[in-house]
Each structure stands twice: as structure tokens, then as C-alpha cells.
């Protein structure tokens, strides 16, 4: 969670992991939360995306995700596929956390299958197969949404797209 102390920015997360210095402790990457790292939530000085970033410019987003994942991928042991609309929960200066969206949310900012590749592949585009767990994260919805077969079909479709791409 990017709202937790020591995890509130990607740079702080790396500093925390380096300070702990344990080979069996790593980072759990969640596509929704880590998108917010690029936006500088909870730590504006560590923002990667430009302040005036326009969401239709995928090249700028991809460059920011490359920078982020290059820094955190070596520490990552678990990977959570997710969608985010670029908004957060929380009102304080360090308690903002990711707002997961449904897989097919039209306001979602991520190209799930493509952007998962920044985590699943190294800088040369080679699969790392380094993660112990890969799952969907983003089921914080009402019962009415969770009880719809479409919700689960969309999640499964997104996960299959990630598998097929990587």
C-alpha cells in the first residue's frame, strides 16, 4: 500500500528494502498502486510523470513505467494485475492509496496486458519468471458488482491477455 510509511513512494520503498536487507523480504507490485507512484501521490518529489501529463500520451506513461519497474523489479516477489483510473482514496498528505477499477473500466489508465510486461520482462524484453505469485487485485467493489458473472469474466479475460502476451 502506498499509504504506509516507508512505502509511500517508489524511492522510499527501495530505501526501506535496502535498509531491511533480507533476501526473503521483497516488494509486492500492484499495477494500480504503482501507477500512483509515477504520479507522485504521497511524495510529489518522487513523481515520474510530468505534472501536466495528458493521459492520451502512452509513450510518456510507458517511459515512466519503465523507470519505475526497472527500479522495483529486482525486489519484486509478488505481482498483482490491476486497473486504476488515476484517482486515490484518502485525504491526508501520506494516506492516499490506490483506487482499483474494474478490468474494463473505460476510465482505466492502464493497458493491462501491455503494462504488465514492464513488471514481467526485464529491460531487454526477456521474461524474468521471477515472481512467486501473480494474481488479480482489485475486487473492492460492492456485492452487486462482485456477484455479476461479467465482473469475473472480465477479470479472467484480462488475466488471459496477460498470460498470452507474456
Predicted regions and their residues:
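Conserved strand-turn element in the central/C-terminal portion of the radical SAM core barrel
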Residues: 1-6
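Histidine-acidic metal/acid-base catalytic patches
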Residues: 7-166
Amino acid at each position: 500500500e502506498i499509504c504506509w510509511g516507508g512505502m509511500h513512494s517508489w524511492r522510499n520503498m527501495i530505501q526501506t528494502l535496502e535498509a531491511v536487507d533480507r533476501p526473503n523480504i521483497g516488494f509486492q507490485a500492484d499495477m494500480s498502486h504503482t501507477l500512483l507512484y509515477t504520479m507522485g501521490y504521497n511524495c510529489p518529489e518522487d513523481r515520474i510523470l510530468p505534472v501536466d501529463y495528458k493521459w492520451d500520451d502512452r509513450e510518456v506513461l510507458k517511459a515512466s513505467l519503465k523507470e519505475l519497474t526497472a527500479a522495483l523489479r529486482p525486489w519484486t516477489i509478488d505481482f498483482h494485475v490491476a486497473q486504476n483510473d488515476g484517482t486515490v482514496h484518502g485525504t491526508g498528505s501520506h494516506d492516499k492509496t490506490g483506487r482499483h477499477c474494474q478490468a474494463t473500466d473505460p476510465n482505466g489508465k492502464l493497458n493491462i496486458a501491455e503494462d504488465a510486461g514492464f513488471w514481467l520482462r526485464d529491460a531487454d524484453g526477456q521474461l524474468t519468471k521471477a515472481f512467486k505469485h501473480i494474481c488479480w487485485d482489485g475486487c473492492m467493489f460492492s456485492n452487486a458488482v462482485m456477484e455479476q458473472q461479467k465482473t469475473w469474466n472480465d477479470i479472467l479475460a484480462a488475466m488471459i491477455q496477460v498470460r498470452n502476451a507474456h
